[in-house]
Every structure is written in C-alpha cells, then in structure tokens.
Amino acid sequence: MTFSLVGRCARTRAYGAAITTSDLAVGSRCVGLAHGKGGVLSQHRTDPRLRDLGVRLLAEGASADAVLTEICGSTPDIEWRQVGVIDAQGRIAVH
C-alpha cells in the first residue's frame, strides 16, 4: 500500500511532498514540485513522463484542474494511476 501527500504552506508558499510505500526509491518516480507553482504526485503504476508534464504545466501557470486534465488525456492507462495536483493558489485536483 502507498500513501502520499503534497501540500503548500500558506505563510511561506513553500511546497512539500511525502510518499511511503513498499517499493524502493519510489520518491524519485512519483513526486514532482515546481518551485513556487505547485506539485504533482503519482502512485500505483507510475510514469515519470506524466510527473514531468505536470511540473512543466504548473511552471507555466496552469491550474490544478488543467494539469490533471492534460495528464489524464496523455496516457491510455489512466485507470491504473492515482494522481494528485496542487497549484499556486492551493487548489487541488485528484484522480
């Protein structure tokens, strides 16, 4: 079983993420942060390309909903993935 979270400090606007699971080195595949813009987490059947897409979109100023829509539309295997996004305004989107 995997547990993950991503959040934003309202005072400093810093982002952070944590993930724990039975697989080794999963953090390097699942967590993506865009400095000052947001964060993306993926778990279960991870694909680092989806994380990278999310980070790029957040860095460009996309909303959490827009990022999640792009991620979901870019892979035929979205039903095998769990994704969470937080944007610069603290809005979240999950799949």
Task: Report residues per predicted region.
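N-terminal nucleophile
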Residues: 1-95
